[in-house]
């Protein structure tokens, strides 16, 4: 447990986490789609890059589920949308542009509107016509 300082800082730290996850998740999905379209074995590619600088919990856990078309939720897309929305609002109030977060949030909202809100966040891969 880390002490984040004054009241409210823990909430802002949670928003930082969601912002970072949005980018990592989108990056993993885009890497997988590129690999598939380049004729690579996606599982082998994930093993290769997950131990290097691209490695993350999103790469190690969520991407491997997406590669298997396993959309069972570890974290619901609808809850991720809620958290990203809060982060986006907080950033806007501070005059901070978060382009990647806004893009991922928009894509996730589209997927939720298509009935995928109760699936895991790895369903983001479906945006790319996986």
Model-derived segments and spans:
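Ligand/cofactor pocket segment of small-molecule handling proteins
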Residues: 1-7
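Helical "substrate-binding/catalytic lid" subdomain
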Residues: 9-130
